[in-house]
């Protein structure tokens, strides 16, 4: 029996990045031998075991053979005669097909070290094309390592295009697509994930609502980048700088979906695109089974981001109604989330990357004023039933009006 550290732990250590999880491959052993050594078996389809002390995963070396469609149609073979090189060959990218023995020596049968040095994401073998999930994984790796200047090898991108055009991505379940997307949204450069999907044709298949934005013009006065698809990715990039939250980043990604519905004869204007985009947000989220909390914020951002841009022109009643509409009294975090997504929208434009966004500050200040109006005082004043809500709203509007007179500049 020989045990090797494999995959991401080896890769990230070589890149000087923190190692979160460690996976191990066991060569020359059997399930019974592992059980006798105190390991606990957890894999049903192939033998994976948990170490009795560390609880890290130890998998018997195995090979895989395509036996069906999609990413689940594989038959695994695990036996003592499967070599380390056999096991590494089934992996997706050369930088993930690295192993380290107990002496610290790196085993690199597929030039993963060279590709690490050259910052290249390259597939190990043609078997890459048998698993459509790998298209999303490569896009996610490209986003994860974009700050290190990694790029996808030309031949790998070509294979990803072939897989997409062959309809392989249609076998992916919504849950897996969302899981990869969610993971990509946590990276430093999530916009790269969607750009890679567009480069290989997968964006049109998996995210048609986003793909439809490319080629749709916006007024050059407000959008020097002109193309709404480009603006969307720029906005997502800015959101990633402003917030680590997946729901903020996803909502930013979806904020302009309504522009994809504008008839070409009305271009480059997109009047009413915010509310129009709500149904597309719902459509996308229902298809991918996006969690409700993430979906709900995306709907609100699509509907209200343009309203927040015009904050100085809003009367106090409209401002309080906005807080009602986003359910801020029960979910106050939404005020900050809308401020961040709206700021990302404004700064996600060519030449506006460092622009100030006072509307965000005013939104936050108005919220602090409105929510500081005490409900208890209304009740103690003798109001009952529906009158409490009406009086509380009246007092909130009055408080916001007083603040706006002092703090928020009047529109010219």
Swiss-Prot record:
Residues that coordinate or bind Mg(2+): 21, 23
Record-listed E.C. numbers: 2.7.7.72, 3.1.3.-, 3.1.4.-
Catalytic activity: a tRNA precursor + 2 CTP + ATP = a tRNA with a 3' CCA end + 3 diphosphate; a tRNA with a 3' CCA end + 2 CTP + ATP = a tRNA with a 3' CCACCA end + 3 diphosphate
InterPro entries: CCA_bact (IPR012006), HD/PDEase_dom (IPR003607), HD_domain (IPR006674), NT_sf (IPR043519), PolA_pol_head_dom (IPR002646), PolyA_RNA-bd (IPR032828), tRNA_CCA-adding_enzyme (IPR050124)
Gene3D superfamilies (alphabetical): Beta Polymerase, domain 2, cca-adding enzyme, domain 2
Residue ranges crossing the lipid bilayer per the database entry: none
CDD domains to which the protein is assigned, alphabetical: HDc, NT_ClassII-CCAase
Residues binding CTP: 8, 11, 91, 137, 140
Comment on bound cofactor: Magnesium is required for nucleotidyltransferase activity. Nickel for phosphatase activity.
Domain called HD: residue spans: 228-329
Any one Gene Ontology BP term: RNA repair
Binding residue positions for ATP: 8, 11, 91, 137, 140
SUPFAM superfamilies per record: Nucleotidyltransferase, Poly A polymerase C-terminal region-like
Classification via Pfam families: HD, PolyA_pol, PolyA_pol_RNAbd
Domain of life: Bacteria
GO molecular function, one term: magnesium ion binding
Keywords: ATP-binding, Hydrolase, Magnesium, Metal-binding, Multifunctional enzyme, Nickel, Nucleotide-binding, Nucleotidyltransferase, RNA repair, RNA-binding, Transferase, tRNA processing
Domain remarks: Comprises two domains: an N-terminal domain containing the nucleotidyltransferase activity and a C-terminal HD domain associated with both phosphodiesterase and phosphatase activities.
Function noted in UniProt: Catalyzes the addition and repair of the essential 3'-terminal CCA sequence in tRNAs without using a nucleic acid template. Adds these three nucleotides in the order of C, C, and A to the tRNA nucleotide-73, using CTP and ATP as substrates and producing inorganic pyrophosphate. tRNA 3'-terminal CCA addition is required both for tRNA processing and repair. Also involved in tRNA surveillance by mediating tandem CCA addition to generate a CCACCA at the 3' terminus of unstable tRNAs. While stable tRNAs receive only 3'-terminal CCA, unstable tRNAs are marked with CCACCA and rapidly degraded.
UniProt xrefs under HAMAP family: CCA_bact_type1, CCA_bact_type2
Family stated for the protein in its record: Belongs to the tRNA nucleotidyltransferase/poly(A) polymerase family. Bacterial CCA-adding enzyme type 1 subfamily.
Extra facts: A single active site specifically recognizes both ATP and CTP and is responsible for their addition.
Name of the protein this chain belongs to: Multifunctional CCA protein
Organism encoding this protein: Escherichia coli O1:K1 / APEC
Source organism phylogeny: Bacteria, Pseudomonadati, Pseudomonadota, Gammaproteobacteria, Enterobacterales
Gene, per the UniProt record: cca
């Amino acid at each position: 029996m020989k045990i090797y550290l494999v995959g991401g732990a080896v890769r990230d250590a070589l890149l000087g990045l923190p190692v979160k999880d460690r996976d191990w491959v066991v060569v020359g052993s059997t399930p019974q031998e592992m059980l006798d050594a105190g390991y606990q078996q957890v894999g049903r389809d192939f033998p994976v075991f948990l170490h009795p002390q560390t609880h890290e995963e130890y998998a018997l070396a195995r090979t895989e053979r395509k036996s069906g469609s999609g990413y689940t149609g594989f038959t695994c073979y695990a036996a003592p005669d499967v070599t380390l090189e056999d096991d590494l060959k089934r992996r997706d990218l050369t930088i993930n097909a690295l192993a380290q023995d107990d002496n610290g020596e790196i085993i690199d049968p597929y030039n993963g070290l060279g590709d690490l040095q050259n910052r290249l994401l390259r597939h190990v073998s043609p078997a890459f094309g048998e698993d459509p999930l790998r298209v999303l994984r490569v896009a996610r790796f490209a986003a994860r390592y974009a700050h290190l200047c990694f790029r996808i090898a030309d031949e790998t991108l070509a294979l990803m295009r072939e897989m997409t055009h062959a309809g392989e991505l249609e076998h992916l379940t919504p849950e897996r697509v969302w899981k990869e997307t969610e993971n990509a949204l946590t990276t430093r450069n999530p916009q790269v994930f969607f750009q890679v999907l567009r480069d290989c044709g997968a964006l049109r298949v998996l995210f048609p609502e986003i793909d439809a934005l490319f080629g749709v013009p916006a007024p050059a006065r407000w959008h020097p980048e002109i193309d709404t698809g480009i603006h969307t990715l720029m906005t997502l990039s800015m959101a990633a700088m402003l917030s680590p939250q997946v729901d903020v980043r996803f909502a930013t990604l979806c904020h302009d979906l309504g522009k994809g519905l504008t008839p070409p004869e009305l271009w480059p204007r997109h009047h009413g695109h915010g509310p129009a985009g709500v149904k597309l947000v719902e459509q996308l989220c229902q298809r991918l089974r996006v969690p409700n909390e993430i979906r709900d914020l995306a709907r609100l951002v699509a509907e209200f981001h343009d309203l927040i841009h015009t904050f100085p022109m809003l009367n106090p009643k409209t401002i309080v109604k906005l807080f009602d509409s986003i359910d801020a009294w029960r979910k106050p975090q939404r005020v900050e989330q809308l401020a961040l997504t709206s700021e990302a929208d404004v700064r996600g434009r060519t030449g506006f990357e460092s622009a100030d966004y006072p509307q965000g500050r005013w939104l936050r200040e108005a919220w602090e004023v409105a929510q500081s109006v005490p409900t208890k005082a209304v009740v103690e004043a003798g109001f009952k039933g529906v009158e409490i809500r009406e009086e509380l709203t009246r007092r909130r509007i009055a408080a916001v009006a007083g603040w706006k007179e002092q703090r928020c500049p009047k529109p010219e």
